[in-house]
């Protein structure tokens, strides 16, 4: 029998149970958020940062389509949609200088140091690289948040936005599973949020084993793993039950 999450009956709303690994999880869609992580040209489009840095982005198109499907279902169910855009100011002050680990580990910054002609083009606010892909367009009522590091909780109002709305369950999509998606979900776990990742609405940076490792970490230690079809089924009207 599916086990409800510990806060499943706290809101008295319409609840649904999502089949997931390692066990099902019950939540109120109207007290939950769908988080779309960094679906920018930088991460999902040929000619973007990841592509120029040597990562394979050739299989991101199905991920974009699956995110579209998940967003449509979530919006219809009354879930808050939050879009993240990763990047910095044009001078990269927000990226940090040599005294910041980000300066040394960000592949975007390292790529620009190797190819100075790309300076100001990768992950710079206002650039094509920074923009969300054409297929994914935020709608009125959605929230779009810039973030300067891998985790969407670092130096952003995400925690305040969620707490002020009574949101405890977060459903994750986006790129990269093993970097910004996992980092944000982990930080959410430490802040007492229930995190679910839709595996076919995410894509890794690196080899396929990076995707598998990230999903293993999430389902074993930090959250739950499901898929878009199952998520949409859980949000269909016949799946809801009222919990007083």
Curated annotation (Swiss-Prot):
Read off the SUPFAM superfamilies from this record.
Isochorismatase-like hydrolases
Q: Does the keyword Hydrolase apply?
A: yes
Full protein name: Ureidoacrylate amidohydrolase RutB
Induction cue:
Up-regulated by the nitrogen regulatory protein C (NtrC also called GlnG) and repressed by RutR.
Any one GO biological process: nitrogen utilization
Pfam families named in the record = Isochorismatase (PF00857)
Q: What does this protein do?
A: Hydrolyzes ureidoacrylate to form aminoacrylate and carbamate. The carbamate hydrolyzes spontaneously, thereby releasing one of the nitrogen atoms of the pyrimidine ring as ammonia and one of its carbon atoms as CO2.
Name the keywords, alphabetized.
Hydrolase
Q: List the disulfide bonds.
A: none
Q: What class of enzyme is it?
A: hydrolase
Quote the EC number. Answer: 3.5.1.110
Query: Family assignment?
Result: Belongs to the isochorismatase family. RutB subfamily.
Asked whether the keyword Hydrolase is assigned, the reply is yes
What residues make up the catalytic site?
A: 38, 147, 180
Molecular function as annotated in GO: hydrolase activity, acting on carbon-nitrogen (but not peptide) bonds, in linear amides
What reaction does this enzyme carry out catalytically?
A: (Z)-3-ureidoacrylate + H2O + H(+) = (Z)-3-aminoacrylate + NH4(+) + CO2; (Z)-3-ureidoacrylate + H2O = (Z)-3-aminoacrylate + carbamate + H(+); (Z)-2-methylureidoacrylate + H2O + H(+) = (Z)-2-methylaminoacrylate + NH4(+) + CO2
